[in-house]
């Protein structure tokens, strides 16, 4: 194994990151690039689990605002994450990376049901595991799924891959020229300051289980490799 800081990671990948500039759906060149970046990290010997969002296809909150029952809208969002997971699996396997998709909502014809011990076994057997379907319950985000699965599989860190954002700022740098980028923060800082890293439930889970979160720009080639190797990029959130 190459020298790495984090040997088992959860990569939180937003649905929007798979859409590219189109902003909706799956952009084939983009998802191919993501798969190639992951293969580079996989070849370092890192155990990789992925939680993928579905915002490139559907958002439960948006559905609720249109008058849908919130739980029903969230279930549609869970199905969107599964579509993204299957597309990512296909791209990874096409370049020789063994990959398993586990869903929190059973659909055995296309993926395994989520079983913690089986997921850990896959990682030990050098397979990438993609967790899809969120937590399987409405009202919980895929950020919370990432924190929950990270705790369950004893991940060393959660890698929050952002679409064009290179870390955590005191304000939106696109709107406020005085915005300051943070190199390090605590989980309580995130919660108390209301910083847009992950939702409060996900932050609390990460804090309670002492899981570091690294926020970085996915669009910069080689950044996933840099994070797992311990290079300081983006913003690292750890401790209380």
Curated annotation (Swiss-Prot):
> Activity regulation here?
Allosterically activated by GTP. Inhibited by UTP.
Query: What's in the GO CC field?
Result: cytoplasm
Residues binding ATP are 12-15, 55, 59, 163, 169, 172
Q: Which GO terms describe its biological process?
A: 'de novo' CTP biosynthetic process; UDP biosynthetic process
Q: Which UniProt keywords apply?
A: Allosteric enzyme, ATP-binding, Cytoplasm, Kinase, Nucleotide-binding, Pyrimidine biosynthesis, Transferase
Question: What are this entry's molecular-function GO terms?
Answer: ATP binding; UMP kinase activity
Q: Which reaction does it catalyse?
A: UMP + ATP = UDP + ADP
The main location is cytoplasm
Residue sites binding UMP per the record: 54, 74, 135-142
Pathway assignment reads: Pyrimidine metabolism; CTP biosynthesis via de novo pathway; UDP from UMP (UMPK route): step 1/1
EC annotation? 2.7.4.22
Q: Where in the cell is it found?
A: Cytoplasm
Q: Which InterPro entries match?
A: AceGlu_kinase-like_sf, Asp/Glu/Uridylate_kinase, Uridylate_kinase, Uridylate_kinase_bac
- Mention any Pfam family matching this sequence: AA_kinase
By sequence similarity, the record places it as follows:
Belongs to the UMP kinase family.
Q: What does this protein do?
A: Catalyzes the reversible phosphorylation of UMP to UDP.
Fill in the subunit field for this protein.
Answer: Homohexamer.
Protein name from the UniProt record: Uridylate kinase
Q: Which organism is it from?
A: Lactiplantibacillus plantarum (strain ATCC BAA-793 / NCIMB 8826 / WCFS1)
């Amino acid at each position: 194994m190459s020298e790495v800081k984090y040997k088992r990671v959860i990569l939180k990948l937003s649905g929007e990151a798979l859409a590219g500039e189109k902003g909706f759906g799956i952009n084939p060149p983009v998802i191919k690039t993501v798969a190639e970046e992951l293969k580079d990290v996989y070849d370092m010997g890192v155990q990789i689990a992925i939680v993928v969002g579905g915002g490139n296809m559907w958002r439960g909150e948006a559905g609720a605002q249109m008058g849908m029952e919130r739980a029903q809208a969230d279930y549609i969002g869970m199905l969107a994450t599964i579509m993204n997971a299957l597309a990512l699996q296909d791209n990874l396997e096409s370049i020789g990376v063994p990959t398993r998709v586990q869903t929190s909502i059973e659909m055995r014809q296309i993926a395994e049901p989520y079983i913690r011990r089986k997921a850990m076994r896959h990682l030990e057997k050098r397979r990438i595991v993609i967790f899809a379907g969120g937590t399987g319950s409405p009202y919980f985000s895929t950020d919370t799924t990432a924190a929950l699965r990270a705790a369950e599989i004893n991940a060393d860190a959660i890698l929050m891959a952002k679409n064009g954002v290179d870390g955590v700022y005191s304000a939106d740098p696109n709107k406020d020229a005085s915005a300051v980028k943070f190199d390090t923060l605590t989980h309580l800082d995130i919660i108390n300051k209301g910083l847009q890293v992950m939702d409060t439930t996900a932050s609390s889970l990460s804090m309670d289980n002492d899981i570091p979160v690294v926020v970085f720009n996915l669009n910069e080639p080689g950044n996933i490799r840099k994070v797992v190797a311990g290079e300081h990029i983006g913003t690292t959130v750890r401790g209380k």
